[in-house]
Amino acid sequence: GPLGNANITAKWDEEIEGISVEGRIVDLYRVPDALTGREKNITGITTVNGWISPARNDIQINVGTHNTNASFIHGFLGGIFKEVNGYVTGPISIIGPLNDVNIVGDAVPHMNLRLRATNVPYHIEGDTLHLRPYLFDFKDISIYDRFGHRSTLNGQVTHRNMKNFKYDFHVNLHELLAYDEHEFNSDKFLATVFANGTLTVSGSDGHPLYVNANVTPTKGSVFAYDAATPDAITGNSFIEFRDRDSLQTFHSDIK
């Protein structure tokens, strides 16, 4: 993603057999508020200092982010989140070798993310995202839905040379908006679901995402099923309603 207007100096360095770089990037952009949807002005400042040595097959670029546009993160998380916007603050480094690049550091995100599997937007802020070799670690990250309900996200994104991303996320839901479909979909139902329970999402680039939910709907949840269309009447075997007691018996039979 764009980082802004850059003023960067690059020069040949005999000692490292490569190019040393130093500079500053300033970006003026707008970010929607997660609760109100109103856009606000953000000034992002990013500093870079380091070197690139093709002769040594190595790189070391230290990057200082301060309200830096988070759209660049979408390239790493695009397989699981369809939208990423906001900003990040904290020191990170791009390190080599050049044929096995990593991004390491600790960044505090203030980001809006839309989960690809459910199309529900969430917001994270204030916690620290740990970037480690071959790993982006989301540990005890507070996430919020657009109503301000809070839950906890844990997960990891792994990669090789900033490619072949794999995702594994686990969310402990506490009255969080877990599903929000306002028009009848191909399965002839729509729903707004606030839930308690657990949600896991896993997958990898170029492959389907797998979603496993063990949840209980809470206050405010709505479910509507269109049984009026001919194909719904003949093809509604995908849904079965049970009372609470029979559901408990059903689960107890699972080995």
Can you describe what each PLM-predicted range is?
Residues 1-137, 154-255:
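Membrane-proximal interfacial segments on either side of biological membranes
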